[in-house]
From Swiss-Prot:
GO terms for biological process: alkaloid metabolic process. Its EC number is 2.5.1.-. Pathway: Secondary metabolite biosynthesis. Belongs to the tryptophan dimethylallyltransferase family. GO terms for molecular function: prenyltransferase activity. This is Prenyltransferase nscD. The lineage of its organism: Eukaryota, Fungi, Dikarya, Ascomycota, Pezizomycotina. The keyword Transferase applies. The gene is nscD. It comes from Trichophyton verrucosum (strain HKI 0517). Keywords: Transferase. Prenyltransferase; part of the gene cluster that mediates the biosynthesis of neosartoricin B, a prenylated anthracenone that probably exhibits T-cell antiproliferative activity, suggestive of a physiological role as an immunosuppressive agent. The non-reducing polyketide synthase nscA probably synthesizes and cyclizes the decaketide backbone. The hydrolase nscB then mediates the product release through hydrolysis followed by spontaneous decarboxylation. The prenyltransferase nscD catalyzes the addition of the dimethylallyl group to the aromatic C5. InterPro entries: Aro_prenylTrfase, Aro_prenylTrfase_DMATS. It comes from the Eukaryota. It is an enzyme of class 2 (transferase). The keyword Cell division does not apply.
Amino acid sequence: MSITTTMTSVPIFESVSRFLPPGNEDEQFWWKITGRHMARMMHEAGYPEDRQVECLLFHRFKVVPCLGPRPHSDTPWYKSRVGGGAADGCPINYSWRFGTSDRRPHNRNFIEPLGALTNTSADPLNEVATKALLHDYSMTLPNVDLEAFWTFAPHYRPRIIEKADMEKLAGASLLVGAEMSPDSRTIDIKAYMYPRVPSQTSQLLTTILPQAMRDAYGEDVCLDSLNFVHDFMTKDPQGCQLVLTGTTGIDCCKLQDTRVKIYVITRNTSFDHIAAIMTLGGRRPISEELLGQLKALWYELKGAPAELPSSEQLPVQTKPDRSKNPIVVPFYFDIQPRLELPDVKAYIDVSTSPVSDLAAANAVVCHLEQHGSGQNPKAYLNVLKDITPVEALETQKGALAFYSVAVKKNELDITSYFNPQVYKRYFAHEVQLNGQRRSVFE
């Protein structure tokens, strides 16, 4: 199978590929697309060459086989929830963490493993392939420990007997993230759980998580940070506007180092509200300078006028069909038994913003350069332009999903989440070969 692509050659990818077993046609396809993407990301981020080889081999043998059949049309046979609403159903997306002044960029990927039982009545929640992959990681990656995950996971499973109810709730319930730092010899694994039953989400803070944490850490576990989130969301005038999504992330590492991430959303888009959540109602101070940086970035990525008062909501956005595009703002709270207060991270959804993907990316890079944060942020632009044609970045949406923002050591720590758009672009660019129409990926 040949590939016709506009992506720039990455020598280390070509060298690694030269001696790899070809695998089946599906694996060849996903490796030549996503393997090249990963190689470009690591090259631009300045990973040591031996680390690039190590991570590429991990990707080829421990990620690619889980991506399922190659596309045969622009409609996915199973629409993965990786990448959220911006994505096209592809079972993988990527992130680029820009780093801070003393930490260089590093990359991650997020996948929903697909297996023989995916999209069948035998596995309506698509759990089998994911759990098998996590078990494999625990056998092959010395740093991976699944004690917390195996303890938490049963608490998130729906207890449903009626077939009709299960059919209504079928869909993704687990995702996996793999973080590959340039300065490490390990690959850090994260699992993300999605309760499918609405009543489970409402019980998350009061029943499910307290019991899961006691089961994992012992009856005397300190729940201060979890209880703080519950109190903040029920008693604080800003916090009570938050809504639980049910999504929960957990580190697959030694129990004492495991973090539990609880995801929430708000529909209040005023910057004063965003700042109140980031500071936990003033309990976690952030300097006025950093709040000013966050405000400027928030307005620019959302296409809001700079003079908009911080107490005002963002202008309502209109879709091409003239319907209203509701804006939600996701956050997560990072819960750890040893912490009294949770850490907070905000997510800026650019997939629904009036700002083009390229303009959003340029805005973030300019911000980092202006404030001396991150290391070589323009390398990120090289990655985006290599994965997605510049014209598409200028005129279409969907390549970029979110930017996340946290505060680390008096700097904004920014991460970009973006999509390969394998299905969306499958027939977008076609070439003639021997009189036949073929995708650029073939």
